[in-house]
Amino acid sequence: MQTRKQKMIPRGLRNNNPLNIRIGNTWLGEREHPTDGEFEEFVSLAYGLRAALIILRRYIRRYHLNTVRLIVERWAPRNENETEKYIQFVCKDTGLMPNTTIQYEDEKTMCKLVGAMAFVECGQRIEKDEIIKGYSLA
């Protein structure tokens, strides 16, 4: 049972899953006894960020979803989200244009992208050092 204080922490941060990845794959760093039932739970924020970065890289490499617009439209579909506002925020926060091509091996851009997306998903900033840890694990 969660305490009131724990419930006040955004779900993505409670689960160390700042991009709110739904349960599906088996990930390195998953919690041994998850309780969420809908979203992945990781042992640390770095592992949750690692999983998010792996998915985003896959979007770019395999599916050629290589712009903020294409990535966010896949990640946060219009039937569940305010996708256009999500895109606008990520672009403003990262300095990227919606249709600028993103290179998956560009650490700085990928870290900015995942940081901005995490803010949209959880409403809180993730420390840059944590994002870099996740990137180094990915």
Where are these regions (language model features)?
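Cell-wall polysaccharide-cleaving catalytic domain and substrate-binding groove, primarily
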Residues: M1-A138
